[in-house]
């Protein structure tokens, strides 16, 4: 894990190394100051020697300035290294997510991925910044201050060897308890993100069903769970500060009592024992040693908080995409023919029954195919195997006579345009959204594609035309308008295969007919697969596939199915009756 995260330093590697070096310089100056202070008092003030006073005062000033300089440099380099590390980590995670298949996304959930890319990375950034500063400062301060105090008085320094193990025991008791709580907190953040995303995306539904109070109470329940867990963690961590203060004041009390006796016994003579200046230095070292332990405990707490985010981010970084391009992949799609050869598919190995079973189909290039079936009959699942959004569990899917697993994924998907059942538009202008299909498309090509999709008629009605701004998710256009824009975007790819997954359900029958007519006249060489609920949308298709419970119930054109399939006739008659009513 450490090796993988270390790769995220990249260009900030040396910056991350310079910060601890500067921190060591700062600590060295801080440890030197009490020694200079002792000499200032013992050999300057006590002996009324102004030359020594001025000399030691200058040394103190230089040490203080050097400490300030090293401290500022360390903080600056640490900040740059931590920020750069977080940027690279977020970059690597985001790029990994882009390679995920649908099944990888389903494994984590979108809300969890958002949490990991935002709050988890922020927590890791803070922990890393503290590590390269405090994790160096505290041990160095502890070691140098202890060595300096041992040089002054080994007898007085023995008090540290009692206090330090006691504080270590307190810390070791706190960390496991706190870790479990923080691990639970970050999982709860995923739930919080899910609630917020669902509420914001579905705010119109929430308001139409007057469910604001219910949503607020749901949000408050999760927020309270996070609050309660943080309170528990803080209550446990609160033990740390009193324990530290007890140790500090106990050490100072012991050093004051024993040290004062030693100063009196030596007559304030360094050659015979302890001096007043050295005793004051011992007080400073006591504070430095025990405060370094206090800061070290904070580092442990921060690292403990970061362990859960580290594990969660590591899961993203090491998750292997289920679908990858093979070596020596095919980089050209010959034509738009499609073959399903004894195809079965399960969304997971734990699924009780397959979503698709024993599917055998041949679709000639350039044909128009209608796909019909009840809700849950696996119509969408069938077409998602063509651009290899999922891999068939059994059998093979061929495009242009070649198994889809042999294609380069980018090449395959570039030749298969798919308008999903759930249409998605991104914030930006209509032009920017359309150019997702073809970044180099000219304005004339945009207009032509929109005319084929019957979108030009409403776009030109907007004051800003094709420069009209689309809100996130396309919230400022109607469902039918959104569908037509998505169809136009797909057409701009100039694909060999075009898949419309119930993508005209929100448009009227006249517009639907106009779109189908444009397809027939303008893109005859493109294989068109149209999933629809209305037989009227697909009855002119060359082939109609009727799906039932993951099986192909029947295949043929409209006239053939009307004669041979009772199931198809039943659907047709019910829809005809509904239209007459």
PLM regions with names:
Residues 1-11, 113:
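A short amphipathic helical element positioned immediately N-terminal to and/or at the very start
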Residues 49, 53-55, 148-162, 232-312, ...:
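Helix-loop-helix
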Residues 14-16, 63-82, 133-140, 161-188, ...:
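Alpha-helical transmembrane segments of multi-pass membrane proteins
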Residues 11-13, 77-78, 99-103, 119-128, ...:
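An intracellular "coupling" helix at the cytosolic face of ABC transporter transmembrane type-1 domains
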Residues 332-581:
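ABC-type nucleotide-binding domain
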Residues 10, 16-73, 77, 150-155, ...:
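Transmembrane helix-loop-helix hairpins at lipid-water interfaces of multipass membrane proteins
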Residues 47, 83, 91-115, 119-121, ...:
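Short intracellular "coupling" helices and adjacent cytoplasmic loop segments at the cytosolic face
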Residues 10, 21, 25, 29-33, ...:
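Hydrophobic alpha-helical transmembrane segments of ABC transporter permease domains
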